[in-house]
Design a protein with these regions (language model features):
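Short alpha-helical elements
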Residues: 1-207
Length: 207
């Protein structure tokens, strides 16, 4: 493992944003080789796994992210590609309170209850076969803003270049990933929501 990786990880922790009571969660795939080369791929043979997203199958890892409404990174976790998006959530959200918005992949009564007991309300869309529920208008509006974190993931891949298939070692992959996340934290103009003071005050209301 390159000696630079540990200092980079420490620095990345220092670059995390401030919890504001509003957060968005998502997971994005990090493919390490083309699907046709899975069986001949050796670098990540023992740790990468096949996973599936809305775009199809991939071989590699998942990067799980939580951001605030300013586009700042609050938490991150790397897992093999076959890990359920919900599994890392309790650890990722440790210390966070307020509202957490995610897609349908985070639907889970057990997860909702676990987070609610910690002071964090998980808000997701519902499936077509589920009974409709009443949400405050502000929460419905924020639920439609989940694209914010998708934009962050897009910038991480296309600007910070955290995903490519030319890695020669696991250590090189990790350094590239951490350095890319750090580079993103230094972007002066991050994707963000422009909330008014009254809207911000709604986030501070008790659950």
């Amino acid at each position: 493992m390159p000696s630079v990786l540990i200092p980079l990880c420490v620095y990345l922790q220092q670059r995390k944003g401030q919890a504001t009571g509003l957060a968005f969660i998502d997971a994005t795939s990090l493919a390490v080789c083309h699907n046709r080369r899975i069986y001949s791929h050796k670098v990540f043979k023992k740790i990468a796994k096949r996973g599936k997203t809305s775009m199809g199958w991939f071989y590699g890892f998942k990067l799980h992210l939580i951001i605030n409404e300013r586009g700042e990174l609050l938490a991150f976790r790397l897992t093999p590609g076959n890990v359920d998006d919900r599994r890392p959530v309790p650890e990722l959200t440790r210390g966070l309170t307020g509202k957490l918005f995610g897609d349908k992949g985070y639907l889970s009564k057990r997860l909702f209850q676990t987070l609610f007991e910690e002071g964090l309300q998980l808000i997701t869309p519902i499936r077509k076969n589920m009974h409709n529920r009443l949400l405050p208008l502000f929460d419905k509006l924020l639920l439609r803003k989940r694209a914010l974190i998708e934009t962050v993931n897009d910038q991480l891949k296309n600007i910070s270049q955290i995903e490519h298939t030319r890695h020669r070692s696991v250590a090189n992959f990790m350094v590239n990933l951490v350095a890319g996340l750090i580079a993103y934290t230094h972007q002066p103009l991050k994707p963000s929501l422009n909330l008014t003071n009254p809207q911000q005050a709604l986030l501070n209301e008790p659950l």
